[in-house]
Amino acid sequence: MRRGKKVGGIVLIPYSAAIAVEQSLEHLWEQILERLQHQLSRPTFETWIKTATAEAFDGKVLRLSTPNPFARNWLQKYYLRTIADVAAEILGHGIELQIGVLSDTSAEPESGAELWPAISPPPAVEVVKPPTTTAGRPPLRSSDLNPKYVFSRFVVGANNRMAHAASLAIAEYPGREYNPLFLCGGVGLGKTHLMQAIGHYRLEIDPDAKIFYVSTEQFTNDLIAAIRRDSMQSFREHYRAADVIMVDDIQFIEGKEYTQEEFFYTFNSLHEAGKQIVLASDRPPSQIPRLQERLISRFSMGLIADIQPPDFETRVAILQKKSEFENMPLPRDVIEYIAARYTSNIRELEGALTRAVAYASISGLALTLANIAPVLTPPTEKMELSPEMILQTVAETFDVSIEDLRGNSRRREVSLARQVGMYLMRQHTDLSLPKIGEQFGGKDHTTVMYSCEKIGQLRQSDPQMGKQLQEINDQLFVASRG
């Protein structure tokens, strides 16, 4: 057996021996990854295991590196035993597993204690692979979760890595770490996607789990209804029975003193019971105006995970994944063109992709950059649209008649279509508010103003409304060019 030559206290390993050790390490880690991939759920494997790197193995000690301390701590706490057991099965004997942080390995300390702390494996953690069906799923608090908002469809980048990892962490082990989890970021950056992905994941593991996903507005409306019906006890029992509660747009609780009061006690009850709380906002707790100090304190006591706008590479990956899932094949130059021009949020980015495909389909043109560039970079001046053209397009979209739009029907679908028509006429014509009112059967200018404000707000807060308005605009754009 060849031995390394000792020079100045350092053992020099022959080149051939070093290659053999490296190949042995690589082969071992590949086998471990292959087995863990079948044991763990896909989001768990890709977030915690696949991102780790095997650094060294001397036959007794396997050293791994993770991309950040967050991932290292999670592996140490929940998956150390699992990895060590799989390695022992492959090798036929037990090993010691040590985990460090990849960014630290460039400068190894004098003592390995800080970088590679000796870790005693924690008690065995049962690895649960989520079942493939969710039969018997209980109804959610407000409405069914969006089936597209799952972890496998979330594109991870530098802008959202921490938020994604934290969301998966609490989906795996709710109520243990990061409680509450406070997701913070601008409109359309993926907060709602992550919240609903948590709900999907928990329901796959436990179909009987009580998962509540509500907006702050829904919570407030339920509270008001309970006060009117004198049923506050039922309201409290309902919300405090949640296993996981996720509240979107929590910033809208500002200034609502009684809602804040009730949410404070609901929060305390759930937190003390070890139930998971997830909140989402467009700003951190300390920047929400007219928010009680005790709520700022509660909201900040867990983990605040910030989400930033995606970089170019992440935007390209988002578009590629969406086109793949939606079966909308796009040329690479089209994807890069969209990614370069829509930089603020994911909602606009995906909307541009949908708009490009819809435009090509409606116009009958090939999906090339030359053909779709006009709709992706629309002219700054208003489209040449007549009131009749807008009325006709809105009527067809909402499956109502122009007479309905000009009439006084209060049916929900007619009222909404009428409000959308007024909004679009304000956007795309030079008509005054009274003149727009005349186009809709002589409606008062205050009615037009209210409709424009309401649809404008819905466009920002309701993704479905934003998508519907964009589709109508696409049709109007094509019509204006005809």
UniProtKB/Swiss-Prot annotation:
Domain IV, binds dsDNA: annotated span: 361-482
PROSITE patterns to which the protein is assigned, alphabetical: DNAA
Region (Domain II): 96-143
Region (Domain I, interacts with DnaA modulators): 1-96
CDD domains: AAA, Bac_DnaA_C
Subcellular localization: Cytoplasm
Assigned keywords, A-Z: ATP-binding, Cytoplasm, DNA replication, DNA-binding, Lipid-binding, Nucleotide-binding
Xref: SUPFAM superfamilies: P-loop containing nucleoside triphosphate hydrolases, TrpR-like
A GO CC annotation given for this chain: plasma membrane
Cysteines paired by S-S bonds: none
A biological process from GO: DNA replication initiation
Residues the record lists as binding ATP: 188, 190-192
GO MF, one annotated term: lipid binding
Domain III, AAA+ region: annotated segments: 144-360
PANTHER family named among the record's database cross-references: CHROMOSOMAL REPLICATION INITIATOR PROTEIN DNAA
Family per similarity comment: Belongs to the DnaA family.
NCBIfam families xref list: DnaA (TIGR00362)
Entry domain remark: Domain I is involved in oligomerization and binding regulators, domain II is flexibile and of varying length in different bacteria, domain III forms the AAA+ region, while domain IV binds dsDNA.
Role this protein plays: Plays an essential role in the initiation and regulation of chromosomal replication. ATP-DnaA binds to the origin of replication (oriC) to initiate formation of the DNA replication initiation complex once per cell cycle. Binds the DnaA box (a 9 base pair repeat at the origin) and separates the double-stranded (ds)DNA. Forms a right-handed helical filament on oriC DNA; dsDNA binds to the exterior of the filament while single-stranded (ss)DNA is stabiized in the filament's interior. Strand separation requires the DnaA boxes and adjacent DnaA-trio motifs, but works equally well with ADP or ATP.
Subunit record text: Oligomerizes as a right-handed, spiral filament on DNA at oriC.
Protein name: Chromosomal replication initiator protein DnaA
Originating organism: Synechococcus elongatus (strain ATCC 33912 / PCC 7942 / FACHB-805) (Anacystis nidulans R2)
